[in-house]
Amino acid sequence: MLLALTGSTGFIGQHLVRELPRRGYRLRVLLRRPTSLPTNTASAVIGDIARPRNMSAALQDVDAVIHSAGLAQAMSGVPEDDYRVINTEATINLARAARRAGAKRFIFLSSIRAQCGPTADTVLTEALEPSPTDAYGRSKLEAERGLAELNIDWVSLRAALVYGPGVKGNMAQLMRLARSPLPLPLGGLRARRSLLAVENLLAAIETVLATQETLRRPFIVADPQALTVAEMIAAMRRGLGRWPNVFWFPATLLEHSFRAAGRNEAYERLSGSLVVDPAALMRIGWTPPLATEVGLARLMQAALDRDPIQLNRITV
């Protein structure tokens, strides 16, 4: 099967470039400008996904497109129109080009933020009405709605926070916290959050590629087990061969401490729940190969093996 991939230089894209050829797929990487690939097992084609008519040749003979490119959530100061142009319009343009080229399926790597804000009071499923709260989430949801109007078999994977070797952002901050030698007073935080191992995302993509039925829908995707922040820290520290060293402390006092220090946003990230139910994807055959606690332990071990000094320099 010949796959076309966008976003090959991003965190998720780099994993896909490396792993998909190992699993027997032929890979054609779509690049905006010439650049070196991390592997010689993929061919590269230069093109601009914002100009779909220029992409027809690049998508010739492709069986499916995996669209991973886009503006990331954590980019501060980006106007909403930029999110719409890059995350919405370019996605729809690429899907149109894929349809003209005869691709059988279009896989859009979306985000759980197309479904909700940074936290949610209920377990999320695809049956709930989406209510994104920022420009990033709205741009992803608008892209899905645009795909629904096209005559192509599309799938949107609304991924929870993805983690794996090389991850940045909020997960990198949590890694730094776990790397600290200090005991942490996080045991009183009972909120749970769903995460997604990059290996489990790859398995989800393979499931969608192998499915014969027409899909044309979004799927929420996350590791089946949601963890508290204390459980995440404990799993990471076990990956370093250390005792978890997380103790109970009243959540209200912890909140007062954070707010007194002007760290309101940091506390919200630690204390807010966001739990999703990936049962719909599992019903079409997805079996995530990696448990969250195992994945987090491996994440820390990989970071330590790769660069023990750099692990200490992850910036909060």
Describe each PLM feature range.
Residues V85, P118-Y163, V167, L184-G187:
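Catalytic helix-loop patch of NAD(P)-dependent Rossmann-fold dehydrogenases
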Residues L3-R23:
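N-terminal Rossmann NAD(P)H-binding glycine-rich loop of SDR-like oxidoreductase domains
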